[in-house]
Amino acid sequence: MAQWVLSIPKGRARETEAHRMNLHQRRQLIEIVRQQFRLDWQGIHGVPHWGRVRWNGLAMARVNGAREDVVELFAFLHDSQRFHDGTDREHGARAADYTLELNREVLALDRPGLELLAYAVRHHSDGLLEADITVQTCWDADRLDLGRVGKTPRVEKLCTEEARDPVLLDLAYRRSLKG
């Protein structure tokens, strides 16, 4: 039940060794994203948020079998094309287009993974609930970090059983408040 309390759990994630990002690839991607990022790098939609989304997502993926590579990339890309921290209804679409560009240059995701990632990024702010488990895991990873903007995640707006687990929900919320 609460495997994620001590660390990101190991589980049955759907990915191969070829899909995993190594540290060098992760740093390269983050530097590319940083060079064009328009907001405060340490702000509410910046790298601290991405780190928490990554942790939340990988914790759930290792339990529910979502593709870890897609979940990790989602964390780094979903807010990468925001023009400001307020309402920016098109940032998901811009980030999905950016994701497709990056796949040609850096990401090298397989077609199914790229389709999942682009869909998750494009629709992450739309309030949807129904999708592939990988997409749902991405959305929940982001929603679990709402405390940073003064909101409490609502259980009925979470897609996965893992995100609705009271232990993870509380842990993620407390982490989100620390900014």
Model regions and ranges:
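Short, Lys/Arg-enriched N-terminal segments with co-localized hydrophobic residues
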Residues: 9-20
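Divalent metal-dependent phosphate-bond-processing catalytic cores, especially two-metal-ion Mg2+/Mn2+ enzymes
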Residues: 18-24, 38-66, 77, 105, ...
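Short coil-to-beta-strand
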Residues: 25-29, 66-73
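An active-site-proximal "capping" alpha-helix that borders the catalytic cofactor pocket
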Residues: 53-54, 90-105
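His-Asp-centered metal-binding catalytic motifs of divalent-metal-dependent phosphohydrolases/nucleases
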Residues: 68-86, 91, 95, 118-125, ...
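Membrane-interface starts of transmembrane alpha-helices
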Residues: 110-115
